[in-house]
Design a protein with these regions (language model features):
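Flexible, low-complexity inter-domain linkers and amphipathic docking helices that mediate domain-domain
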Residues: 1-109
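Active-site C-terminal subdomain of aminotransferase-like
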Residues: 312-315, 322, 327-434
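Active-site phosphate-binding strand-loop segment of PLP-dependent enzymes
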Residues: 261, 265-318
């Protein structure tokens, strides 16, 4: 069978008005091998497609193309069950229902949104399992080692206030002073009349802190990745990213129009092979990794990544959202941790919302690149400047980190202590190492949500992380550690978690 023909033409109608199953399966195989760059011998046609190491955006893109090609939608309830290629082929080749579809009534047009239907299917499953929604709970007060909800104090492991600065008195004082001087908002793009002296000070301090020539601050971390990556790359370029890369970076990559390929998590041999195959066909190549992976709590091999980017003449961009203020003896991030000059990383991206007690994002790098972004990046020039309050909070937080590096060491000790206690209790913490993120892997999505609810009732605030953010069967409770946690907090959390994990058989989805 001519695979190119299969790839580009509509499926052939089969008996009963459906599509030939063999053609549908071959089309799905071609999408996962061609569009996603997965070797054919890696495809187990009976395994869940979410187990191929692709991010959720890539999977959604492939399935959308399959729907367009087959001329029919995939049932959201099937997607919720994490289907295999074979199950998808059976579904798309089955004869359509004999019942003619009813015209959508006014106000019911949202039924055409597959994502909305899948979302609603998830909540139906939650209701059927008798589980309370663990998300969007309301809290009061600062996010410290403890937090208050409805008048009840809980030990808090659901906030990435790594260095305990979000409620620091000096940070709050700096915020008040900035609002008194500059107001609540700069009320304009910085390109026009929104620039304030404090913006330049923060960018200078940030650049010095991470070891770059210059830095540029955006209003949000997600928007930073989307805008910068989407702006720098184009259809002539190649973007390769770790399969666990954050949604913001993957979204920016997709919006750029570049050829986008994921490589298996932290597999530098696979990255090398991918670049060997693809690099020559593109004007430039961008490699995207995270300094600390927020789902796993593990690190990339920076030295090997630098070697590969030199070998293949590629750019290297590191998202330091969870590594700035965490890695390195003084919290300067992944370059300090690996003793690699920061200049070896072409684009250092980070957020202000975690260790730096604020809200916003930044990129740092060569002066020439940052100046170009300052004048041309849409997410910067067409957005209001970061608020004076957030600017002042981040600026004062960096000054405190520089003056008190012991906070970084306190975080490191707490994370190592928690990991050691968890392992001693028989809990599965996956690949977590050297970071402030320690997952406890518990199995099915429903198990993770049930455990989160039970721990909340017992006085521990920890959020579940479920598919498609993680592989099916590897849902987890994600513990964010802080320099403020005490040994008592850590011991209590591990004991209560282990008691509940081992109190019943693992639940399914």
């Amino acid at each position: 069978m001519d695979k190119d023909a299969i790839h580009h033409r509509q499926a052939t109608p089969g008996p009963g008005g459906g599509f030939r199953r063999e053609e549908v399966e071959e089309k799905l195989i071609s999408l996962f091998t061609g569009e996603a760059g997965i070797a054919r011998d890696r495809l187990d046609l009976t395994a869940p497609i979410s187990g191929y190491g692709l991010d959720s955006v890539s999977v959604a893109s492939i399935l959308a193309e399959a729907e367009t090609w087959a001329g029919r939608r995939i049932d959201p309830d099937l997607l919720w069950k994490q289907p295999s290629i074979r199950a998808l082929a059976d579904h798309l080749s089955a004869p359509p229902s004999a019942e003619a579809p009813k015209p959508a009534a006014v106000g019911e047009g949202y039924d055409s949104l597959t994502g909305l239907l899948e979302f609603e299917a998830r909540f139906r499953a939650l209701d059927e399992a008798g589980l309370e929604d663990p998300f969007f709970r309301t809290f009061d007060g600062p996010s410290g080692a403890t937090i208050v909800s409805q008048g009840r104090s809980l030990v808090n492991f659901a906030s990435y206030n790594y260095l305990g600065l979000a409620g620091h008195e000096e940070v709050k004082r700096a915020v008040r002073d900035a609002v008194d001087r500059y107001g609540a908002s700069v009320s304009a793009s910085r390109l026009s009349s929104g620039e304030r002296e404090i913006h330049g000070r923060l960018e200078s301090v940030l650049a010095r802190f991470v070891g770059a020539e210059e830095a540029l601050v955006f209003v949000g971390g997600h928007a930073t990745n989307v805008s910068v990556i989407g702006h720098l790359c184009s259809p002539q370029d190649l973007i390769v990213y770790d399969s666990l890369m954050h949604n913001s970076a993957v979204t920016g990559a997709r919006l750029s129009g570049a050829r986008c390929l994921a490589f298996p998590h932290n597999d530098t041999e696979a990255l090398d092979a991918l670049l060997n195959r693809e690099r020559r066909n593109h004007r430039s190549a961008l490699v995207l990794v995270e300094g600390v992976y927020s789902t796993e709590g593990d690190l990339p091999d920076l030295k090997e990544l630098v070697r590969l980017k030199r070998k293949h003449e590629a750019w290297l961009m590191v998202d330091e959202a969870h590594s700035i203020g965490v890695l390195g003896r003084t919290g300067r991030g992944i370059a300090e941790h690996f003793a690699v000059p920061a200049s070896e990383i072409d684009i250092l991206m980070g957020t202000l919302s975690k260790s730096l007690a604020s809200c916003g994002g930044y990129v740092a790098g060569a002066r020439r690149l940052i100046r170009y972004l300052r004048y041309t990046c849409p997410g910067f020039i067409f957005s209001a400047g970061i608020s004076p309050a957030n600017t002042a909070a981040a600026l004062r937080a960096i000054e405190i980190v520089e003056a008190e590096p012991s906070r970084v060491e306190d975080l490191r000790v707490n994370a190592a202590t928690f990991a050691r206690m968890a392992l001693a209790s028989g809990l599965d913490i996956g690949r977590s190492a050297h970071s402030g993120v320690v997952p406890v892997i518990v199995g099915g999505d429903m198990q993770a949500m049930r455990l989160s609810n039970e721990l909340f009732a017992a006085g521990i605030n920890v959020q579940p992380l479920v598919s498609p953010a993680v592989e099916p069967g590897r849902a987890r409770l994600r513990f964010f550690l802080s320099s403020l946690h005490t040994d008592e907090h850590l011991g209590q959390a591990v004991r209560l978690t282990a008691d509940r994990v081992f109190a019943r058989p693992a639940l399914g989805r």
